[in-house]
Amino acid sequence: MKLAIFDFDGTITKSDSFRGFIIFYHGYRRFILGVLATLPSLVLYWLNLISNNNMKQRVITHFFKGESANKFRDLAEKYSNNKIGNIIRDEAIDKINWHKNNRDEVVIVSASIDMWLKPWCDKNSIKLISTEIEIKENKI
């Protein structure tokens, strides 16, 4: 048995699931306003002055800090069940299935948040290593 490791966003998907989730959660208008509000962090990232991790943490904080964890989980699962399939590359699924048919262990490693990736991975019998969002007192 071999280990087959895949990145999720941009490898298995045609587009970024994080951006898609923000739009699904808040709507396109709030997404655009949020991008404008976090533009300084995005510019710092594009100039390699802050890490991807740092930039993503700032964006997550902007869009989700203080949100109900129950609402977040619920919408993440709905996003996974209703939207993720639309952005999956056919050739990526073919390659994943090839590995599974050869009894290889398939693992997705992603910086994206587990709450929308895990339902899709579970449905497709794929192991997942991803970002877990911090929850305190049922708040993001």
Residue spans for each PLM region:
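Active-site neighborhood of HAD-like aspartate-dependent phosphohydrolases
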Residues: M1-N48
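Helix-loop "lid/cap" segments that line or gate small-molecule binding pockets
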Residues: V43-L47, M55-F64
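Short, acidic loop-to-helix structural element flanking the phosphoryl-transfer center
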Residues: E77-D114
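Residue-level signature of catalytic and energy-coupling elements of molecular machines
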Residues: G10, F72, S110
